[in-house]
């Protein structure tokens, strides 16, 4: 809450601080507005001006552990929340998930997105062949412009400081260190920037924004006249790539390489109780409760709002550090509680729908006949 408070003040106070990207997800804004509902208009104004970039996801999920339906619901919810606040996201920012499924371009294009930005999943062979920018095609032919974040989403974090993350409060950034970092980032991408532009990220997990960024960029620009430094947005960068006329190589299939950033595949089997609870929760929602609400007609439609809340709770368990079981115990205790709530809601809705269907079928208790109502939902 304090971070977004300060961010709104900075963006309103300093027009030279061009923009801020809020991590590709909207769940944090839901939490913020629950505490600061009076700031909604301020957020909407900055979003519409293109200075606060939000979405497209509700949360940044793992790509393999949630079901395909859950990934779609996640993106749909994030897009809806973004549009409510004045945004129209077109770029699939998913920086830190541990590898990516082959059908991600299909999901993105199906919901109107044009690009995908990622950090983990490129192999050495793919790096040599594809570089930082390429086209990614799903099995149905859907394609997205795809951007590989070679040094992750923190390559320019804590710019001007000796490390990329840490507590630098009270420490003045040094312009020469900013120049050194920027030069190193560009050198690492030599020969791999087909559009002629690199995207670098000034941020990291749990790191505050840098109010002095415009001053650091101005100083670096003076020291690096051979390049043009722009404080930009993801959308602006993708506009440049797609209008550059660069011929981009094509990739088909999963992204599961480990060349610069490991996919940490062992997380797919850590805390297996979470994986089992997730599978059951998804099955109850997708295969049992939702089909029954359709069959139950008007009564089912009355119950649909309960399932929307169940989906919200389930999606809050799908950030990669949650569902992958690689966070602290306190986080996963919350995950367990949400899974229980999802199961309770889904089973209650399913039970009520079965009762409604039995009533419609004329099932009556007459003391001499036992009725068995069997329903196949998947």
Task: State what each model feature region is.
Residues 1-377:
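Catalytic-domain carbohydrate-binding cleft regions of carbohydrate-active enzymes
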């Amino acid at each position: 809450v304090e971070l977004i408070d300060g961010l709104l003040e900075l963006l309103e106070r300093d027009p030279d601080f061009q923009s801020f990207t809020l991590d590709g997800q909207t769940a944090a804004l839901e939490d913020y507005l629950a505490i600061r509902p009076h700031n909604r208009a301020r957020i909407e104004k900055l979003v519409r001006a293109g200075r606060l970039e939000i979405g497209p996801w509700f949360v940044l999920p793992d790509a393999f552990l949630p079901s395909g339906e859950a990934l779609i619901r996640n993106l749909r919810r994030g897009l809806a929340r973004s549009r409510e606040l004045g945004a129209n996201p077109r770029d699939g920012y998913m920086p830190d998930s541990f590898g990516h499924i082959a059908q991600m371009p299909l999901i993105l294009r199906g919901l109107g997105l044009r690009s995908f930005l990622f950090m983990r999943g490129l192999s050495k062979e793919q790096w040599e062949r594809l570089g930082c920018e390429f086209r990614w095609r799903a099995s149905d032919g859907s394609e997205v412009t795809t951007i590989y974040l070679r040094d992750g989403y923190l390559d320019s974090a804590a710019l001007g400081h000796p490390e990329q993350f840490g507590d630098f409060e009270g420490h003045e950034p040094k312009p020469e260190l900013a120049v050194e970092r920027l030069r190193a980032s560009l050198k690492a991408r030599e020969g791999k920037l087909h559009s002629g532009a690199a995207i670098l990220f000034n941020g990291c997990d749990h790191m505050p924004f840098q109010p002095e960024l415009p001053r650091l960029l101005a100083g670096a620009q003076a020291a690096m006249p051979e390049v043009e430094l722009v404080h930009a947005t993801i959308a602006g960068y993708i506009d440049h790539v797609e209008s550059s006329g660069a011929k981009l190589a094509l990739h088909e299939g999963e992204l599961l390489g480990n060349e610069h950033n490991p996919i940490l595949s062992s997380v797919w089997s850590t805390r297996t109780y979470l994986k089992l609870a997730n599978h059951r929760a998804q099955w109850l929602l997708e295969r049992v409760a939702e089909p029954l609400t359709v069959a139950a007609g008007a009564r089912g439609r009355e119950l649909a709002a309960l399932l929307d809340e169940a989906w919200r709770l389930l999606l809050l368990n799908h950030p990669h550090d949650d569902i992958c079981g690689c966070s602290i115990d306190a986080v996963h205790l919350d995950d367990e509680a949400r899974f229980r709530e999802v199961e309770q809601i889904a089973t209650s809705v399913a039970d009520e729908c079965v009762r409604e269907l039995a009533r419609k079928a004329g099932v009556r208790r007459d003391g001499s006949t036992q009725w068995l109502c069997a329903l196949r939902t998947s």
